[in-house]
Amino acid sequence: MTTSLRPAPFGRVLTAMVTPFTADGALDLDGAARLATYLVDHGNDGLVISGTTGESPTTTDDEKERLLRAVLDAVGDRATVVAGVGTNDTRHTIELAQRAEKAGAHGLLVVTPYYSKPPQAGLLAHFRQVADATGLPVMLYDIPGRTGTAIEPETMVRLAEHERIVAVKDAKGDFEASSWVLARTDLAYYSGDDKNTLPLLAIGAVGVVGVPTHVFGTQTGAMIAAYLRGDVDGALALHRQLLPVFTGFFRTQGVILAKAALRLAGLPGGPVRPPLVDATAEQVARLREDMAAAGFTEFAEGAEERRG
């Protein structure tokens, strides 16, 4: 038996890709191209560039465009490349969206405006204006724990009426609200919290925008594929296998440990930019244990000692 799901407009397994930096904090475009290639070769059919895990608050508009172009050049013919363009300023978000479209992005990730905590009418206007500004499909990003404002279910239903608002990255953790919206719209839901991927699939989601997928993309894809073909027991077994990294990557800010995991795997990532700080030796040691518990074996020699 197969499980029937709505279409997945951006793919099934997307990684919220880190932005690689050199040891002195400069943008590492060669590293970004290598990392994007690795991700697509290892189970990802989509990438999100300049999202939260991409440290978008600390990259300039020009850096975002250069990064996007480098990733598109590397894998744009093999994977969906989604540009994170969300800010807390509608005009700035529109500018970033238009630059991303011109650069060749396949879609846009637009986070709820943060800090200013707009009312639902403000969210409606913001997302509609951004969606009107380009011809690209839009994935809304609902993460009230970071932004301070949730997209209420009724607002989500109204936003779904826009022809270019086609998906949601759901990091709200409210399964009742997600179920309510899924029952009333054609929006494609993507889990924005790795540990909730399988539960969200069970209520109609189509995939994940993940962080552990930097090194566990193949296994995450296998979990989703098992569920889609009706092998719920197989999907559950993979979910349980991956739980150590689904939770372990988030003992501190996800990008900090994502970059530590990339170092452990010998992959490009480099340091984080301030005000974030790199993982401590203790955090890296625990992360290595988590990765090993989830089945990862390809640790780079001496990776714990390397920085950048």
Curated annotation (Swiss-Prot):
Gene3D superfamilies named in the record: Aldolase class I
Cited PROSITE patterns: DHDPS_1, DHDPS_2
Protein's gene: dapA
Source lineage: Bacteria, Bacillati, Actinomycetota, Actinomycetes, Acidothermales
GO cellular component: cytosol
Organism: Acidothermus cellulolyticus (strain ATCC 43068 / DSM 8971 / 11B)
Enzyme class: lyase
UniProt-annotated site: Part of a proton relay during catalysis, residues: T52, Y115
Catalyzed chemical reaction(s): L-aspartate 4-semialdehyde + pyruvate = (2S,4S)-4-hydroxy-2,3,4,5-tetrahydrodipicolinate + H2O + H(+)
Entry binding sites for pyruvate: T53, V209
Pathway: Amino-acid biosynthesis; L-lysine biosynthesis via DAP pathway; (S)-tetrahydrodipicolinate from L-aspartate: step 3/4
The protein, known as: 4-hydroxy-tetrahydrodipicolinate synthase
